[in-house]
């Protein structure tokens, strides 16, 4: 039997998210220092810890060479953190900006969708990348019904930044699904482009939460 080697992991695989993990730790502290109420502290904790978990798990998954079995479990955890981070990013808006039934329903919908996404990847670890990308985009858009109230509360500027972050996440999902562009497969491939777009989107959303949402209460 002829042994066929698997694809070579790019040398920079996971490095961007490793740097982002280290940056997310003081970023969480900054969020907590900006909180004036207990409710804001809860929102900041959920959101900030999700960034730490997202980038930490991703860096661990992609930087370490795992056994096939361990890699499958780490892949499940990596996908789970993506779903959690999407819901957690919406949480400060649901808790601090939106009000009434809309806030409750929107939070329930996005966290319910995140749970569904987690179950999908736990039960179907080999789900096509295109399906995973669609799930992430749909989940990210699940709070779009809150847009009018969001604009009225924080204005068009922060809402535009929020939309920009969503567009960056969507672009990353497209790169992940189609595996293009793939500039230097042995060093910096399509997955690194995806990770870079995720970081850019996360920074954009972080600015909105830290500057406009937490001081809202």
Please identify what each model-predicted range represents:
Residues 1-217:
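Multi-pass alpha-helical transmembrane bundles in non-GPCR membrane proteins
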